[in-house]
Amino acid sequence: MKAAILLAFAGLALLSVICHASENVEQDSFEEVFSAIFAMEDDLKPKERVCRGYGLPCTPEKNDCCQRLYCSQHRLCSVKAGK
């Protein structure tokens, strides 16, 4: 009888260790998934443009509008007429 109880306690201790180890592995996999999601999120953020797009404020002296646009007298990037 004492041996059966001792064996039951040893089995419970072993089961506890196995469950704890599997939780650690599961936690690590969750951390990997979350870090991958956050890494992708950084890639999806809009990049800063080097030039100004249509209708955006600009500075005529800097000529900071994108190709085929010019800085109008209203200090907005506009489409070049002609070519």
Curated annotation (Swiss-Prot):
One term of GO molecular function: ion channel regulator activity
Coiled-coil spans in chain: none
Localization, UniProt: Secreted
Domain of life: Eukaryota
Source species: Chilobrachys guangxiensis
Cellular component, GO annotation: extracellular region
Propeptide regions on this chain: 22-49
Its job: Probable ion channel inhibitor.
Disulfide bonds: C51-C66, C58-C71, C65-C77
Tissue expression from the record: Expressed by the venom gland.
Protein name: U15-theraphotoxin-Cg1a
Segment forming the signal sequence: 1-21
Modified residues (Alanine amide): A81
Swiss-Prot/TrEMBL domain comment: The presence of a 'disulfide through disulfide knot' structurally defines this protein as a knottin.
Record's keyword terms, sorted: Amidation, Disulfide bond, Ion channel impairing toxin, Knottin, Secreted, Signal, Toxin
Protein family membership: Belongs to the neurotoxin 10 (Hwtx-1) family. 66 (Jztx-24) subfamily.
